[in-house]
Amino acid sequence: MVFVVIDGLDASGKSTQALELSRFIRGQGKTVLLRFHPAEDNPFGAKAKQFLYARGKSAHFAAALFYMVDVIRSILLYSWRSYQYVIFVRYLMGTAYLPRPLDHLAYHFFAAVVPTSRHMFFLDVAPEVAEKRLLENRERLEMFENIRELGRTRLKALSLAVADDWTIVNADGSVAMVQQTIRKFLSGSSESK
């Protein structure tokens, strides 16, 4: 089984790239499990999503807590199933939304506990590009979807991605260019860390 993680800021193109990649892999006759987080098919993901539209520190922590439980639930329920590829959209980088130093503590705690892979992609998008995409495509914005939070979270997530040897992909470009980069790196080794 090849475990792939596609993570990044809001509006970095995570879902689009994961869908493109899963279509490509299925087109090669391989089986794929694709999970998005927060997932709305369970109470933890639904609560995480609900708190993302709330304001305040308690909503911030509640969103992070329910998000992490949602991801862990997916690992427990889906990672052991018989698929040739398992793709998770949003995984460890949700911890970057926590205040310092909790972001680093939570990231390293979860990275030590959950499965990791050589195929962990951080889609890096400039905050200005992300904000433009959000304003064009969303009717309602989540608590972190503003230029200030996008910039702050990007710096924290990039530092975590660099420190833990993620593949950082410039996601400011076209869908095709980003997909080509992901496929190029994915065609290398498929062993787990």
Regions found by a protein language model. Give the residues of each.
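Conserved RecA-like P-loop NTPase ATPase core
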Residues: 10, 89, 157
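Glycine-rich phosphate-binding loop of ATP-dependent small-molecule kinases
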Residues: 1-63, 116-119, 167-168, 174-193
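NTP-dependent small-molecule kinase module
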Residues: 22, 128-193
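Conserved phosphate-donor/acceptor-positioning beta-strand/loop module used by diverse small-molecule
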Residues: 89-90, 113-134
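ATP-dependent small-molecule kinase phosphotransfer cores
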Residues: 33-108
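Anionic group-transfer/hydrolysis microenvironments
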Residues: 7-9, 91-92, 96-97, 126, ...
